[in-house]
Amino acid sequence: MDYGKCATQTTHKIITAEENKRKLTIDNPSGKVVRKIQVDGCLQIKSGKRCDYMFEIDAPISQVIYLELKGCDIKKAYDQLVATINIFRVEHGECKKECHIVASRVPRAGPKVQQLKITMLKNKQAQLFVSTDQAFVTI
């Protein structure tokens, strides 16, 4: 899919996305092709909810990382991730999927967060990670 000016492609060893003091850092030691796509505020999508960024790994795509940088509303962030997965379900059908919520405050592995992780895995075949302020991923 062509994302136009909303995407940048790189093989850099360190790739980041940052917004309002919240940050995801992707460690790419083997120099894989990574396409960083700004979804919210750039892509013209009819659906209202969407996550902030997604990262497509390799060509053809073998893995997708969906990212929502959020204040403290974990449920809203979860809904935005699910909406984005649904929008790109054809393009990312069989890919390994990871979803990251990087929030300013996160309830300590409480039952609500655990339930969201279970639901995401069951319904969308995607792992959900919830972090405070910063998250790190190695691909």
Residue ranges and their predicted role:
Residues D2-G4, C42, I101-I139:
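Domain-level recognition of nuclease-like catalytic cores that cleave nucleotide substrates
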Residues I74, F88-V113:
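Nucleic-acid nuclease catalytic cores
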